[in-house]
Amino acid sequence: MMEFFKTADVVVIGGCIVGTAILRELSKYDLKCVLVEKEPDLAAGTTKANSAILHAGFDAPTGSLKAVTNVRGNKLYHELQKELGLDIEWTGSLVAAT
């Protein structure tokens, strides 16, 4: 088993949303990739315990890196839903201005 790690081009540590997204993107290239996860299943840590909200970017300062990446990330989820046939329920949200 250890020999496999020695010959890998990339080792991704963590099998939650970020690690698996990185691994998926790397799979598009001619690379030997390995995913290492301490839990018995994927997405068993932070990803499993999150609030399942995809932030639209409205709460970050206009033009900030956070706003730009929130909008881009939200768009990517819509693209991934179509590409992978994900069962995502888009419920929307309500924001109260104070």
Question: Residue locations for each model-derived region?
Answer:
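Glycine-rich FAD pyrophosphate-binding loop
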Residues: S27-A49
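N-terminal Rossmann-like FAD-binding beta1-loop-alpha1 element of flavoenzymes
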Residues: F5-L35
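Dinucleotide-binding Rossmann-like beta1-alpha1 core, especially the glycine-rich loop
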Residues: A52-T98
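A structure-centric signal for secondary-structure junctions around beta-strands
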Residues: T7, D30, K48, W90-T91
